[in-house]
């Protein structure tokens, strides 16, 4: 309903965007609706869409008949070249197929999702759309996230003096109830514990770490 409402609201707002930026499967039907149900209307004719994929694992899969009933989309577009994937309606696939351009979080991830290992079953589609696939590297605002004055860091440091990192390590050990040990290996990270976040790299070297460090 949200995806359809985005398009339906535009005439009431008297706003014709040049580009609609869509993000992940939750907005995957916006490019689909635009080209199948709204595209013939002159109001929408020149609107383009960019579809951003942050994680190929989350695809928004549902029963085809239920999606047809809820959305009003024509049944014939639920085929292997468009919205159907492994017998289900796939919102992520719809966004990728119908968008004018597709972006993702880095050039390396843009490559990874064209491979069987990274494509989560849609690598063939990503390979087919690679001409409009762009990897845009995620980044930080270094003015806001600066360890020299970041309000969320207990003890500040910079590239010229990193001595306070030891104090931060001690602070984190105390805050989490760990034994305070300057020599102990400590990794602090805010993340989902999945291979996609690099935890597989930790698993890859953990045996060597256990053999060479007191952890």
What does each model-found stretch correspond to?
Residues 1-215:
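Catalytic cores of nucleotide-sugar-dependent glycosyltransferases that transfer UDP/GDP/TDP-activated
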């Amino acid at each position: 309903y949200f995806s359809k409402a985005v398009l339906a609201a535009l005439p009431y707002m008297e706003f014709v965007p040049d580009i609609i930026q869509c993000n992940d499967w939750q907005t995957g039907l916006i490019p689909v609706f635009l080209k199948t149900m709204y595209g013939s209307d002159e109001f929408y004719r020149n609107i383009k869409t960019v579809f951003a994929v942050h994680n190929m694992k989350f695809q928004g899969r549902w029963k085809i008949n239920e999606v047809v009933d809820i959305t009003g989309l024509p049944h014939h577009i639920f085929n292997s070249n468009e919205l159907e994937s492994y017998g289900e309606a796939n919102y992520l696939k719809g966004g990728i197929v119908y968008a004018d351009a597709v972006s993702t979080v880095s050039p390396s991830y843009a490559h990874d999702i064209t491979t069987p290992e990274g494509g989560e079953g849609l690598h063939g589609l990503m390979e087919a759309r690679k001409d409009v696939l762009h990897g845009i590297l995620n980044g930080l605002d270094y003015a806001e996230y600066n360890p020299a004055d970041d309000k969320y860091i207990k003890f500040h440091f910079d590239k010229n003096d990193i001595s306070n990192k030891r104090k931060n390590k001690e602070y984190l050990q105390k805050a989490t109830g760990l034994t305070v040990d300057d020599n102990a290996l400590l990794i602090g990270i805010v993340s989902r514990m999945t291979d996609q976040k690099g935890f597989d790299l930790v698993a890859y070297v953990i045996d060597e770490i256990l053999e060479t460090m007191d952890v």
